[in-house]
Amino acid sequence: MKHFSLLFIFLVILLATSYSDAFTRNSFPKDFLFGAATSAYQWEGAVAEDGRTPSVWDTFSNSYDTGNGDVTSDGYHKYKEDVKLMATMGLESFRFSISWSRLIPNGRGLINPKGLLFYNNLIKDLKSHGIEPHVTLYHYDLPQSLEDEYGGWINRKIIEDFTAYADVCFREFGEDVKLWTTINEATIFAIGSYDQGTAPPGHCSPNKFVNCSTGNSSTEPYIAGHNILLAHASASKLYKLKYKSKQKGSIGLSIFAFGLSPYTNSKDDEIATQRAKTFLYGWMLKPLVFGDYPDEMKKTVGSRLPVFSEEESEQVKGSSDFIGIIHYTTFYVTNHQPSASLFPSMGEGFFKDMGVYIIPTGNSSFLVWEATPWGLEGILEYIKQSYNNPPVYILENGMPMVRDSTLQDTQRIEYIQAYIDAVLNAMKNGSDTRGYFVWSMVDVYEILSGYTTSFGMYHVNFSDPGRKRTPKLSASWYTGFLNGTIDVASQDTIQLWSNFSVSSSL
């Protein structure tokens, strides 16, 4: 054990001194928010309790063998314990989502009083501990009743129902909520759910990779994406007309943003990378900032890409007070077919239209991501230059590790340090970034990997009916950073080990 301790201390020293610039919490503005995140289906559990009805995520997860969110971290019953952990950590903000089918079980109409009570209690508990709630209205979990009735996000009826749902949330919770995200990672939501079939409700054209029972990959992602933008804009308009002057909050949309870098120095790969940015970033950002889709997308996708009316264009333009960024890693982009590509560019859908090949960096794979903080810095610089430097929140950033592998998650610490440093560098270069959220606060059910990997700073024992929480080393590091007791690039990190019991084990 002594040999292990010395080896670990050496690794921590190496980790703590591997960055050129020291930074602390005080290196960031006082109003910059450091937080952590979860989502309703992934954290709450209690899927059949107190009036909640099934969502499309319940249906989707029960169709596969990667587990489900029936109990998961049991946040519904353990939220007070988790809020205390956040307060001890010094967390400044907690991002969570509201389960539409818990609050309004039929998707529209009567409010579930027990669902309303749960979210009011959670929000007030956060506020009483000085933690700012950042509330996401939609995170992959459409009430199954609306999917069954009219097809959900591929039907324009969703705009009215989503706006009515948002109205309930603004009215009931808005006095205590200053940050709202309408729809989570809109780009990858439309692609994963309506092209690739890898996210609920699992639509895609027939292919050899995923067995979808319905869908059209060449049209549905664009229809869903269009309705996402219109639903967001409608909810945003409602908030600004009815609530903003009194509640004084902000409302935004989030996108999933891979870092994108040319695979070679060739002109072809540079052009391919710009094309990928146009499709993966510009698809949502250009309408939000300028009121219409990128010309290259309109030319390529043609009549399959819906058209904004003049009124819709004006409503979408400027509808986001901020842009939320979901980012985990970076991929190389090439114009020429490589031996291994992450996403198939041939097929019927989005990636065929994009017409480039995406290659993992280093040892990255679909579920294991290499730390590439320069990729996030590049995204923030690109958004600054291309989209009028809007306010940005990094709403998810974290590192997956094999579940139950270790509490000494030094790789995760290194990852978080590097990405916070990248955010600081981008801000020094003028990016209007205003917050950073680690995914995830505690171990949760993951959308792609179920319970095989975990991102949490707190380990959750999913075999224990009580879902015991145990801090990982990353929780201790984040606590030290937020409380000003760790100066990155100094050797203060060594103190973590002396405070983190050698006997701490799973």
Swiss-Prot record:
Instruction: Tell me a Gene Ontology molecular-function term this record carries.
Output: beta-glucosidase activity
User: What does UniProt give as the signal peptide span?
Assistant: 1-22
- Source species: Arabidopsis thaliana (Mouse-ear cress)
- Carbohydrate attachment sites? N211, N216, N363, N429, N461, N483, N499
Among the Pfam families in the record, one is: Glyco_hydro_1
Name the GO terms of the biological process aspect. Answer: carbohydrate metabolic process
Q: Which domain of life is it from?
A: Eukaryota
Transmembrane regions: none
- The record's disulfide annotation reads C204-C212
Tell me the classification of the organism that encodes this protein. Eukaryota, Viridiplantae, Streptophyta, Embryophyta, Tracheophyta
- Name under which the protein is recorded: Beta-glucosidase 9
- Recorded GO CC terms: peroxisome
Q: Which UniProt keywords apply?
A: Disulfide bond, Glycoprotein, Glycosidase, Hydrolase, Signal
Q: Where does a beta-D-glucoside bind?
A: Q42, H139, N184, E185, Y328, E396, W439, F455
**Which InterPro entries did the record assign?**
Glyco_hydro_1, Glyco_hydro_1_N_CS, Glycoside_hydrolase_SF
Coiled coil ranges (UniProt) are none
- Reaction catalysed by this chain? Hydrolysis of terminal, non-reducing beta-D-glucosyl residues with release of beta-D-glucose
The family line of this record is:
Belongs to the glycosyl hydrolase 1 family.
Cite the EC number.
Answer: 3.2.1.21
**Catalytic residues (positions):** E185 (proton donor), E396 (nucleophile)
